[in-house]
Amino acid sequence: MISPFLVLAIGTCLTNSLVPEKEKDPKYWRDQAQQTLKNALRLQKLNTNVVKNVIMFLGDGMGVSTVTAARILKGQLHHNPGEETRLEMDKFPYVALSKTYNTNAQVPDSAGTATAYLCGVKANEGTVGVSAATQRTQCNTTQGNEVTSILRWAKDSGKSVGIVTTTRVNHATPSAAYAHSADRDWYSDNEMPPEALSQGCKDIAYQLMHNVRDIEVIMGGGRKYMFPKNRTDVEYEMDEKARGTRLDGLNLVDIWKSFKPRHKHSHYVWNRTELLTLDPYGVDYLLGLFEPGDMQYELNRNSTTDPSLSEMVEIAIKILSKNPKGFFLLVEGGRIDHGHHEGKAKQALHEAVEMDQAIGRAGAMTSVEDTLTIVTADHSHVFTFGGYTPRGNSIFGLAPMVSDTDKKPFTSILYGNGPGYKVVGGERENVSMVDYAHNNYQAQSAVPLRHETHGGEDVAVFAKGPMAHLLHGVHEQNYIPHVMAYAACIGANLDHCASASSAGGPSPGPLFLLLALPSLGILF
């Protein structure tokens, strides 16, 4: 048994030794604060240029506690204490909070939230691209209740559009950009009930290829949902679970190819080598399906077959940026959510760090003068870290104390519920007896569940670029796409555009903006 006094003594020594010398000088903190103040004062001159490009980064399940833990991890991966590190999203000048509830759920799911931040209306949990008049699983409540997304609005305005995700391309988040479904789980017709099929509802993979036929870039997982039932997967030939699922016998990849104009350059790729061999500036349409289901966790990724999120984002921007009218790109770090559901904090946080790297890559390829970039989450998780850990403590390490009840150590990271609930001999498992630094270690939880749940608290919204100042304070989640549309002069937000101009030219003044906003029904 570890002595609590020994743990406390070690923690005290570590705390003293890990304080950087410069931080002991008050001048360091005063100078830092003064520089931050100067940066804030510069924001008084608002950037009201008309947006050419819109990039939305969605960290699925990336609540504020995940953002903070990812920040520390990023720093520690660079051999720093971690707490002082800045994520790319930390550098964005405008921050707001988003209220994530669904119309019928206090703690939301990823489908109803995706409908909110992509389509501009709140919806029921489990439904995508439809209003709250649609009931989950009830196909006959879909017709007439469809709502369109910012991706559709951008495409209708002449912009190029793209979707990049680390989940299936027909998963909850991306599907709200193009599909209208009473159930997020209708990935292919194989997952649909006979009643829904007989009533004429289409699966989400089918809708991906048919609803918005000219999406320029689609990258992620989900290969098996595009091919006929039992068709062998190109990569996992012996894996029955990787085989095609479609009961209708359709080859949606071939259908995707058939919809593309002959004079355009269209490419379907299924591995990283094929992707990186392409000249993106010579590609008009790209479909990349790199796994039968979701893509692998970043820590498990096969660098030969699976591209990283950063690589996919870079290629997507190169393809989309050829359009002089600009583009809309949705990027999802989707497996942050999966890591948390499995109680595998290390997997989740490495996914978040990789998404932050992709944010940096996108920032280096675009300009704040004409590109609005938004980073947010659909919901949070019951994930936390604490325990009075000293500065520089490994984010996956032990707290510097033991429980004053069972006298056992505990990791700083814990979950409110989930699969990490472990009882050994009638008592809480002693974490010092297991490898709590393992990639797949499941952090302890207070309540036993097979899958950890979402959290219901607000999530952060980070914004930079033209009109980013419209994201401030606390907003309903469905407000977000209205800001993007207003800034880019697309969709229904066109009244102010005649006197507005593109980046670098004269812009509508603050008074004009204040007069224009009420017509959009926007409340602050």
Curated annotation (Swiss-Prot):
Residues 1-17 form the signal peptide. InterPro entries: Alkaline_phosphatase, Alkaline_phosphatase_AS, Alkaline_phosphatase_core_sf. The active site is at S110. Its cofactor is Mg(2+); Zn(2+); Ca(2+). Disulfide bonds join C139-C201, C489-C497. Ca(2+) binds at E235, F290, E291, D306. The modification Phosphoserine is found at S110. Binds 1 Mg(2+) ion. GO terms for cellular component: mitochondrial intermembrane space; mitochondrial membrane; plasma membrane; side of membrane. Phosphatase activity is specifically inhibited by 5-((5-chloro-2-methoxyphenyl)sulfonamido)nicotinamide (SBI-425). This is Alkaline phosphatase, tissue-nonspecific isozyme. It comes from Felis catus. The lineage of its organism: Eukaryota, Metazoa, Chordata, Craniata, Vertebrata. The gene is ALPL.
